[in-house]
């Protein structure tokens, strides 16, 4: 964007000169252009936001002035503005002051004032979160209770209702009301399971994933391991299906640790066995060996615990036999012999004890093979914790697609986002505030479509998940240019949720929207995009859309994508086959090449010729 703008120093000089002669509008416009240089030096950019704050204050645009001050301003520069803005902007500002306040008592007061302002603005969830941050759990609980009743009575959003109930359970525990907490946990689990089922049914696995993550949190808060286990089993399933193997393996490790901590050793051993099989399938032998050794250790612990509590001896015996298998698969033969010795010492019938004794004798001189056994390496781990969706997603629900609010969250979080991202968010918020002012003055239906298009273009530069909700909200407008701009913007958002709106766009009554959506598909080429792309390919009646899906799939280097593309070449129409061949010629991944070479002899004439064409173009000998 910056290369099409006038030089920064010229724009700043123009703004200063205009402001000096009393032309605040000209100064504002020049500074607006200058701020488009979002990769400028930080000291220059901070100075410009300060200048813009002064100009907008002169023009009476206090919300815009406060927004500019949010970027790098101080409490001193913001205090004169907060009395002139709506409660939500006051609340956000007070929250930011509280977050950086060193004095604990003043910090609590600021959080309380922020909560009061949120309540005044009718924003119950955000008020409750502010109460929690100020350690006022009793009043937070009352707010969560009010929100939970509201959502449950409407019956429209199981997910939001489940989150509200979970927050009610959390705050009930912190205020000592365990009975209310149990009741809220029960309701929350029921609602979240219902929501997850619905999301999976309509193909929104990423939303179901959030439900299962909350189930894990519920189990940890309440001490109910069954919720932890249900959550992890489904989280791992979705991560595996989305080919996010490192995330899946890390989740396996977390699940095993959680099961051990709860004393559910048998469940931990079973999870370790599954982890070992998955790691081996994914070509990670060290992780597989680590999981196998963990499994063997845990089965021995299961056996010891069973015998200590007086359970039938067969339970301990079966657990030790599982340990034998695990050690054997890992090549730890001396340890196999040690486990057989333990089996021969169990209080079993004499024939079985002798059998295990003979087995032990076969391993007297056996040695353990040297193996590499290590957990998932640190550089492959995702150390950023799972977001508190029980707060984050309720805030999104409450914001109802507001671009100004979503962008404001980004500006006010310098610890989370880069300078460039926050600058772009500031520009998007200023655009959104201008649009809101026009809507308030003339009505939304009388605001020119170009204003909404400009907002979509500004939002597209932010490229964060939190911006998807405002874009989804914009897509519901009637003006075709707005929907086209939204779809074009979505091509920059590499998230599975992006496909929800794109699938709507692909069935839009306007051909221009469909065309832009098909182009956007080709940009969404990340591993876990396979499932939605495959679904679009199967469901679409448009050859052009199917071809776009094929081109996107050709850039995803996974076995599943390669297998599907080979199926397209073998069984589907000539247009789809041609699109697949041309796309695969330009692709860089090797999964399709490996699969095609191995199965070339089994292909029929046209399909074999097409695959040979791809292999020759990629300079692969056949």
Q: Model-derived features: where do they sit?
A:
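Hydrophobic/aromatic side-chain positions at a characteristic register within alpha-helices
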Residues: 19, 57, 99-102, 106, ...
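Residue-level detector of extended alpha-helical repeat arrays and alpha-solenoid scaffolds
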Residues: 124, 423, 448-452, 483, ...
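Alpha-solenoid repeat junctions
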Residues: 347, 434, 459-463, 490, ...
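Amphipathic alpha-helical scaffolding segments comprising HEAT/armadillo-like alpha-solenoid repeats
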Residues: 407, 423-442, 464-474, 495-507, ...
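Short inter-helical turns and helix N-cap capping residues of alpha-solenoid HEAT/ARM repeat scaffolds
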Residues: 448, 478-479, 509-510, 541-542, ...
């Amino acid at each position: 964007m910056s290369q099409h703008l006038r030089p920064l120093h010229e724009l700043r000089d123009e703004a200063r000169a205009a402001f000096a002669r009393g032309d605040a509008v000209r100064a504002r416009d020049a500074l607006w252009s200058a701020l488009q240089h979002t990769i400028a030096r930080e000291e220059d950019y901070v100075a410009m936001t300060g200048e813009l704050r002064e100009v907008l204050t002169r023009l009476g645009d206090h919300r815009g002035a406060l927004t500019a001050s949010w970027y790098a301003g101080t409490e001193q520069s913001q205090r004169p503005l907060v009395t002139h803005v709506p409660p939500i902007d006051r609340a956000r500002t007070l929250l930011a002051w509280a977050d950086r306040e060193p004095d604990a008592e003043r910090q609590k007061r600021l959080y309380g004032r922020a909560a009061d302002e949120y309540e005044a603005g009718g924003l119950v969830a955000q008020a409750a979160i502010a109460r929690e941050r100020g350690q006022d759990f009793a009043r937070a609980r009352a707010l969560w209770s009010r929100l939970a009743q509201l959502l449950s009575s409407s019956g429209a959003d199981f997910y939001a209702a489940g989150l509200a109930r979970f927050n009610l359970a959390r705050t009930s525990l912190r205020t000592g009301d365990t009975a209310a907490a149990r009741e809220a946990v029960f309701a929350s689990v029921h609602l979240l399971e219902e929501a997850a089922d619905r999301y999976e049914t309509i193909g929104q696995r990423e939303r179901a994933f959030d439900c299962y993550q909350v189930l894990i949190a519920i189990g940890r808060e309440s001490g109910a391991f069954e919720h932890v286990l249900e959550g992890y089993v489904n989280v791992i399933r979705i991560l595996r299906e989305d080919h996010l193997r490192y995330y899946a393996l890390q989740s396996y490790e977390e699940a095993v640790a959680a099961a051990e901590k709860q004393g559910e050793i048998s469940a931990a051993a079973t999870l370790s066995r599954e982890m070992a099989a998955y790691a081996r399938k994914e070509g990670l032998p060290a992780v597989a060996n680590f999981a196998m050794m963990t499994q063997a250790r845990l089965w021995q612990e299961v056996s010891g615990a069973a015998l200590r509590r007086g359970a039938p001896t067969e339970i301990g015996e079966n657990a030790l036999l599982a340990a034998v298998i695990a050690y054997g698969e890992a090549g730890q033969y001396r340890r196999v012999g040690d486990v057989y010795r333990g089996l021969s010492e169990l209080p079993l019938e004499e024939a079985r004890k002798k059998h295990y004794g003979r087995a032990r004798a076969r391993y007297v001189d056996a040695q353990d093979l040297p193996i590499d056994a290590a957990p998932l390496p640190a550089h492959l781990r995702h150390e950023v914790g799972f977001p508190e969706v029980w707060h984050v997603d309720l805030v999104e629900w409450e914001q109802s697609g507001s671009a100004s609010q979503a962008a404001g969250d980004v500006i006010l979080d310098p610890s989370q986002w880069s300078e460039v991202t926050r600058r772009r968010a500031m520009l998007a918020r200023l655009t959104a505030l201008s649009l809101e002012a026009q809507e308030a003055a003339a009505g939304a239906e009388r605001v020119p479509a170009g204003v909404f298009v400009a907002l979509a273009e500004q939002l597209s530069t932010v490229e964060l998940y939190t911006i998807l909700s405002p874009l989804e909200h914009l897509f519901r407008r009637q003006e075709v240019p707005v929907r086209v701009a939204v779809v074009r913007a979505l091509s920059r958002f590499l998230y599975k949720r992006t496909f929800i709106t794109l699938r709507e766009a692909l069935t839009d009554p306007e051909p221009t929207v469909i065309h832009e959506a098909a182009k956007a598909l080709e940009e969404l080429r990340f591993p876990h995009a396979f499932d939605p792309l495959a679904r679009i390919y199967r469901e679409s009646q448009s050859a052009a859309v199917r071809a776009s899906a094929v081109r996107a799939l050709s850039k995803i280097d996974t076995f599943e994508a390669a297998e599907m593309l080979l199926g397209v070449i073998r069984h589907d129409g000539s247009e789809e086959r041609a699109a697949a061949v041309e796309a695969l010629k330009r692709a860089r991944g090797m999964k399709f090449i490996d699969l095609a070479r191995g199965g070339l002899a089994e292909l029929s004439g046209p399909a074999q010729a097409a695959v040979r064409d791809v292999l020759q173009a990629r300079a692969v000998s056949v």
